[in-house]
Design a protein with these regions (language model features):
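A beta-strand edge to alpha-helix "cap/lid" segment located at domain peripheries
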Residues: 1-39, 51-161
């Protein structure tokens, strides 16, 4: 059995040429923590094959639907920061999946939430790849605590203007 990696991926790691799974994961967290939709678009497969099952929006299929969820998150007046830890990476030359946990914080005045999310991400080479880079094709995240899930959903809903 593989031992989970405890050193977190936060998005500040060297992205190199994005040929290694850890680099693809770091690119994703750099885009998420930096609220960078362009970087997230580079990380995700830009086709209808992409799917995300996320605590915020049910199942989103295709990059346009996934992008809309990130736009909603980034439109809130809160700030999100997460890191990926306690993970294992499995795969082959054309596909890998990372299974682990995200921990982080969502700050929105006057309070914040500490987040704990079970996470799986799947990446592949092929399809609409560029230079052999990995593209994310699936994400599944689950918040186990129902109270935390409700508070997180409410917190990221943009305030009325």
């Amino acid at each position: 059995m593989r031992q989970p990696i405890q050193t977190p991926i936060i998005g500040r790691e060297d992205l190199g040429d994005l040929s290694r799974p850890e680099q693809a994961l770091a690119q994703f967290y750099r885009g998420l923590n930096g609220r960078d939709l362009a970087l997230l678009a580079e990380n995700w497969e830009p086709s209808d094959d992409a799917a995300m099952d996320n605590p915020l929006g049910g199942i989103a299929r295709g990059w346009p639907a996934i992008r809309a969820l990130y736009e909603r998150l980034f439109a809130s007046d809160g700030r999100l920061w997460v890191e990926f830890h306690d993970y294992t990476i499995h795969g082959s030359d054309s596909l890998f999946y990372a299974v682990g946990r995200e921990r982080g914080r969502f700050e929105r005045s006057p309070a914040g939430l500490d987040l704990a999310i079970r996470t799986t991400r799947i990446f592949r080479r092929g399809g609409r790849r560029v230079g052999g880079r990995w593209r994310q094709v699936h994400h599944h995240g689950s918040i186990e605590d129902p109270a935390l899930l409700g508070a997180y959903r409410q917190a990221v809903t943009p305030a009325p203007r």
